[in-house]
Amino acid sequence: MSEITYPSQSRELVCFSTIQVQTVQDGIVNLFFAYDVFSKFIMSTPGCINLTPANIMKQVDFLMHHKDFTIKDIPFTLVMDIGQDLEEELNLIVEPFKGKVIFDTDFIEKEMMPDIAVMMKLVGKGS
């Protein structure tokens, strides 16, 4: 795990990852979630069927323009566990928004995925 400094306010440290879900209409779909480590606020971007480099970059770009993400204009770190081979391109997307991308699968699993699992369980129950 890389050295990650825990945030002192929201939007300083955001995890961004995907989970796969089975749908009736489209089969397996990749759902993308952003997770603010400080506030534990979860945002989603549109899903996609194929997890291609173009789709990963499109999802990050969508996040940069998401109304809930653009509330604060502060430097941030986007922690990802997909798209490692796209690091340069992803940083080009986030740099205009004062961001930088790092990759840390262990951090995503520890910080983000437990809350995503709870959310998906609640959604599955219709709560």
Q: Which residues fall in each region the model found?
A:
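RNase H-like DDE/DDD metal-dependent nuclease/strand-transfer catalytic core used by mobile genetic elements
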Residues: 4-15, 19-28, 37, 41-127
